[in-house]
């Protein structure tokens, strides 16, 4: 799902590493320690929460979070909470990064000072206001000026303690006067529609005879202002809560009798500034924010075609895809969009086979094969993440969940044993876990995804051809990925592979570390097992597995997953879990009478059906076959005055569901839409609002079977692979090429230098792999031309958008400093281009 903007789609995403907090204020009690967690918020909407770290003022979280951002936002915020068992969790402090500042911290570990949180720091939202100055004749026949202040609506007000019942006060204030008026309270909404007008007398009637038409006294104008304050009506004894304010000097009407615009709400001038930022501690974050502006598909044809034929270029180092890996600062930065694009078009196996073969030819020692962070390694890693996640979950998740729930101690380091623990018992528990995981892995070969098997086959063939005297290299070439870079990391950090929702507790983490080390060594088939461990206790423990049957099992498994033409005939019939989690659903109304209330349920989606039950593991209360899903669409907030709602439309009724936040709502809508995309009876129109009180709220039709009034969203073509958009990935690659244009040009120079000079290579060119200077130069020329054409399209789009942009519109309210900077930059660009 993307924001549509006149011929192009805008995608936003963010990848966050929440590291640790330092020097949090101590708890005011004898213990002084705190139980803290961190939340990630789009403005104030929570979209992710870390685990709770107990009894620490320097909690380490070590959690990663990625999401597609489905709406506009101003701040990416992080709140540190202190858990309270008996009361509401209290906020220690927050970090708020403006959207426009995210690039300053792009992919860098940064320490941020925690800021104090109060009503002023939480101000958000915008207000639509009109001021109109007019002349009126009083009862005595005297003409005077009246000011009409019309407040239309507000959007995106903060929600306070789970509710928002807003009202506004409109005040005309000056040195010697203050006249306030108040709107009605709007219940249960943070997007109130007020549409109320308030009138104020601006000048004395006697002043009219001294001034010309609309030329009222300057001293009054300069000193008067309109102030709009938003409040949340509260029943608490502490009074109503401040939501934000707007101050407008009346002199804006000096040149026009009316003024209408949208404004961002601001904190009060006298906001609480008592605490210094460093009083609250700091938080370490790594944030990667990406915004892609994607044109229609034909714009990307030249660059996309160049990338897709990379596997056929001789040598492969002269291909566009390989060049991308050469110029990017981080190979993974290149691998992510590259693999997704090639996987989408069925070209990932030929390309990886080509670059793997080239890398093997450059490798001198079979013991170091595929051990570096090369483009080959990163591309295979990314392919395994995309294609192998379900395989990984089916293989490991049941045992990992059992380990996390059992909390058995498996510590085998005598130095780290706790009082009362028995070394032999711990060693036996660990041995059983390792044995179980080793068995499920080595028996899972038939379930390994085909694309992974095809890649492993090419690795095996290339390694065996290069090192013909080493009989084990055909195994180590494959095990270096499937064990060392797939299974072992997933066991070590299961949260990074969605095997657990959060980082595991210290004891479980230690158990998983020991298991991961052992599995990694078993899979590596190294000649000297004991020498693989630095710790003597690990060498002792490994004696349990120093039998030929374990090596044979590994080799049989590696043979199976690297065999040519291997296919899993059962893979299509197997139910694949795609997504699950708690949401709130509205009763479907199978009975004609009775309350249709909202209930929290555990939802589960597979490639066969969509179900919900009371709790995870219970029997389903409702099963919806995928073929019965006719459409999945958003539900307008006005239907039930609830945010983040969507509807799953079936032949007889619609199931109304509320997700926990906007990110989850987008994820569920996307995956439900994609999994039901091929249904033959999919609807073309739908009702965007609910059927309540005998009619549809959107079109007022009275029949509950009336045809929809709004076209269904198009979704993606039926043959598209899940979660991959080829045009978006090409746009991402274009952005990388454009970012590293200087390196592309430097690489061109290196090709020219190599073509005419056979002497020692210049140091500045030595970082590039250039096997054929002429072929590489030819590709570089095509890449630079394709990137240049796309850059011209982007520049034209920016110019067109700038011409249409109005400061003070609903999209660009007044009060956004970053937008003012954007206006200034675009003005300079436009002037320069002229």
From Swiss-Prot:
ZnF Btk-type residues are 679-715
> Which GO CC annotations does the UniProt entry carry?
cytoplasmic side of plasma membrane
Question: Any idea where the Ras-GAP domain is?
Answer: 346-561
The C2 domain sits at: 1-112, 123-263
The cross-references to SUPFAM superfamilies, in alphabetical order and at most eight, read: C2 domain (Calcium/lipid-binding domain, CaLB), GTPase activation domain, GAP, PH domain-like
Q: Where is the PH domain?
A: 576-677
The UniProt function text for this chain reads: Inhibitory regulator of the Ras-cyclic AMP pathway. May bind inositol tetrakisphosphate (IP4).
Specify the protein name.
Ras GTPase-activating protein 3
- Gene from which this protein is expressed: Rasa3
């Amino acid at each position: 799902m993307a924001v549509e903007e006149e011929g192009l789609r805008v995608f936003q995403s963010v990848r966050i590493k929440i590291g640790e907090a330092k020097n949090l204020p101590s708890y005011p009690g004898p213990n002084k320690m705190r139980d803290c967690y961190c939340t990630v918020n789009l403005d104030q909407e929570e979209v992710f929460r870390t685990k709770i770290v107990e009894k620490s003022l320097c909690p380490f979280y070590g959690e990663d979070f990625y999401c597609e951002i489905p709406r506009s936002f101003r701040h990416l915020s992080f709140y540190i909470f202190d858990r309270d068992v008996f009361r509401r969790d209290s906020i220690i402090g927050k970090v708020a990064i403006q959207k426009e500042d995210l690039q300053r911290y792009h992919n860098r570990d940064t320490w941020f000072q925690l800021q104090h949180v109060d009503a002023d720091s939480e101000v958000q939202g915008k207000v639509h206001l009109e001021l109109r100055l007019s002349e009126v004749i009083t009862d005595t026949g005297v003409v005077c000026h009246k000011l009409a202040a019309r407040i239309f609506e507000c959007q995106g007000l903060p929600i306070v303690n789970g509710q928002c019942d807003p009202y506004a006060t409109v005040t005309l204030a000056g040195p010697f006067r203050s006249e306030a008026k108040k709107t009605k309270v709007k219940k249960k909404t943070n997007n109130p529609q007020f549409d109320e007008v308030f009138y104020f007398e601006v000048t004395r009637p006697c002043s009219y005879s001294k001034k010309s038409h609309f030329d009222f006294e300057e001293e009054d104008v300069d000193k008067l202002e309109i102030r709009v304050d938003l409040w949340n009506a509260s029943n608490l004894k502490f009074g109503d809560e401040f939501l934000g304010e707007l101050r407008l000097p009346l002199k804006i009407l000096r040149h026009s009798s009316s003024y209408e615009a949208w404004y961002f709400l601001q904190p009060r001038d006298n906001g609480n500034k008592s605490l210094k930022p460093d009083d609250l501690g700091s938080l370490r974050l790594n944030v990667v924010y990406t915004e892609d502006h994607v044109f229609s598909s034909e714009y990307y044809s030249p660059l996309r075609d160049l990338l897709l034929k990379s596997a056929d270029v001789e040598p492969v180092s002269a291909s566009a895809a390989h060049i991308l890996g050469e110029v990017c600062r981080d190979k993974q930065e290149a691998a992510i969009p590259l693999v997704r694009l090639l996987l989408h078009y069925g070209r990932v196996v030929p390309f990886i086979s080509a670059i793997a073969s080239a890398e093997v030819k450059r490798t001198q020692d079979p013991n170091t094969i595929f051990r570096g962070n090369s483009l080959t390694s990163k591309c295979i890693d990314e392919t395994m993440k995309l294609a192998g996640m379900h395989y990984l979950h089916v293989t490991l998740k049941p045992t990992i969940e059992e380990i996390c729930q059992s909390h058995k101690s498996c510590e085998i380091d005598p130095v780290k044993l706790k009082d009362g623990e028995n070394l032999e018992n711990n060693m036996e528990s660990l041995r059983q876990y390792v044995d179980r995981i080793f068995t499920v892995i080595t028996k899972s070969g038939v379930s390994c995804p085909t694309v992974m098997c095809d890649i492993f086959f090419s690795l095996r063939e290339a390694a065996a051809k290069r090192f013909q005297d080493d009989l084990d290299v055909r195994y180590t070439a494959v095990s270096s990925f499937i064990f060392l870079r797939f299974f072992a990391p997933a066991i070590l950090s299961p949260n990074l592979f969605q095997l657990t929702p959060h980082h595991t507790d210290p004891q479980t983490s230690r158990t998983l570390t020991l298991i991961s080390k052992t599995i990694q060594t078993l899979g590596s088939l190294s000649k000297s097992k004991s020498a693989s461990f630095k710790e003597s206790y690990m060498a002792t423990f490994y004696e349990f597995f120093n039998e030929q049957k374990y090596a044979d099992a590994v080799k049989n498994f590696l043979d199976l997953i690297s065999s040519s033409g291997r296919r899993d005939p059962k893979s299509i019939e197997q139910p694949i879990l795609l997504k699950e989690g708690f949401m709130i659903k509205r009763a479907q109304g199978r009975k004609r009478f009775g309350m249709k209330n909202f209930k929290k349920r555990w939802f589960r989606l597979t490639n066969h059906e969509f179900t919900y039950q009371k709790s995870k593991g219970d029997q389903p209360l409702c099963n919806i076959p995928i073929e019965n899903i006719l459409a999945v669409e958003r539900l307008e907030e006005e239907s039930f005055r609830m945010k983040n709602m969507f509807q799953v439309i079936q032949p007889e009724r619609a199931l109304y569901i509320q997700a926990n936040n906007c990110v989850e709502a987008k994820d569920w809508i996307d995956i439900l839409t994609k999994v039901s995309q091929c249904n033959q009876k999919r609807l073309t129109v739908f009702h965007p609002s609910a059927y309540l009180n005998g009619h549809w709220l959107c079109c007022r039709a009275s029949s509950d079977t009336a045809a929809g009034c709004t076209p269904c969203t198009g979704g993606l073509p039926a043959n598209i692979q899940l979660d991959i958009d080829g045009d978006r990935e090409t746009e991402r690659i274009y952005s990388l090429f454009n970012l590293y244009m200087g390196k592309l040009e430097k690489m061109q120079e290196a090709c020219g230098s190599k073509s005419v000079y056979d002497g020692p290579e210049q140091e500045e060119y030595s970082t590039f792999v250039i096997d054929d200077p002429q072929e590489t130069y030819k590709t570089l020329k095509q890449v630079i031309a394709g990137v240049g054409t796309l850059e011209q399209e982007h520049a034209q789009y920016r110019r067109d958008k700038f011409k249409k942009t109005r400061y003070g519109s609903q999209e660009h309210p007044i009060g956004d400093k970053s937008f003012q900077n954007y206006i200034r930059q675009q003005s300079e660009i436009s002037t320069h281009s002229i």
